[in-house]
């Protein structure tokens, strides 16, 4: 059986990457994007008191909460104890992979080249985060690397925008991680949560329109 968060990712396709200067801003940002329809949220360990944020969000209806920038086994264990349903990292750590496997949660390490992608998959990655995908070449890069690796689920991150979110999915990504283009830390710090909700709705509506086109509506 696949991890719960992977099923949710296949359904929802969007992950809000929450970075903020303090826990209150992170909580507000997570709730704001969820109100706009983006209901998978990654609380990065760069957020002060990130574990507190995860713990406060873990039981909110319809929200799937996970940890980002998970660099060590200790961070992985702490995130899992706080209720994280997935672990995402910019790199591959076999210790973090082992913690995810032991808990049965989604593990999504970062990779850039085909060699790194295959190493991540061999270590137990359910999904591989292609990062930073904007520098690598965007959707065109995804199409190229999926030719030899069509069976490895990929998450685009680092350089994703409203304009390229659908092209990334059309190129074969199972999902897209959205950082500043959605949950801008400056907006969160300023308390402009209505703008974050508006951005989330725009991303969701962009996907809905693409789905209708694909269905021939």
Predicted segments — roles?
Residues 1-85, 102, 151, 162-163, ...:
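Conserved N-terminal beta1-alpha1 strand-loop-helix module at the mouth
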Residues 19-22, 47, 67-73, 89-93, ...:
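Glycine-rich beta-to-alpha transition loops that act as phosphate-gripper elements at the mouths
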Residues 26, 54-58, 121, 142, ...:
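Distinct, well-ordered alpha-helical segments
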Residues 29, 72-82, 115-123, 137, ...:
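Catalytic cores of alpha/beta
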Residues 37, 61, 83, 91, ...:
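Conserved functional loop/turn residues at catalytic and ligand-binding sites
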Residues 39-43, 80-82, 102-103, 113-142, ...:
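Glycine/Thr-rich beta-alpha phosphate-binding loop at enzyme active sites
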Residues 86, 90-99, 129-138, 172-194:
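Glycine-rich phosphate-binding active-site loops on the catalytic face of alpha/beta enzymes
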């Amino acid at each position: 059986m696949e991890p719960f968060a992977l099923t949710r990712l296949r359904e929802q396709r969007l992950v809000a990457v929450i970075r903020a200067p303090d826990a209150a801003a992170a909580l507000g940002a997570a709730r704001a994007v969820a109100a706009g329809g983006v209901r998978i949220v990654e609380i990065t360990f760069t957020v002060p008191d990130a574990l507190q944020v995860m713990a406060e969000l873990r039981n909110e209806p319809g929200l799937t909460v996970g940890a980002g920038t998970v660099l060590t086994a200790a961070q992985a264990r702490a995130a899992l104890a706080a209720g994280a349903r997935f672990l995402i990292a910019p790199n591959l750590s076999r210790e973090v992979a082992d913690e995810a496997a032991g808990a049965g949660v989604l593990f999504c390490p970062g990779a850039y080249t085909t060699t790194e992608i295959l190493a991540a998959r061999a270590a137990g990655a359910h999904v591989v985060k292609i990062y930073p995908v904007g520098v690598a070449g965007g959707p065109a890069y995804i199409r190229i690397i999926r030719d030899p690796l069509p069976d490895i689920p990929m998450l685009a991150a680092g350089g994703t925008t409203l304009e390229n979110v659908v092209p990334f999915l059309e190129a074969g990504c199972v999902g897209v991680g959205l950082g500043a283009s959605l949950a801008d830390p400056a907006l969160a710090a300023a308390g402009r949560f209505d703008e974050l909700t508006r951005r989330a709705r725009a991303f969701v509506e962009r996907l809905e329109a693409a789905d209708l086109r694909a269905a021939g509506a």
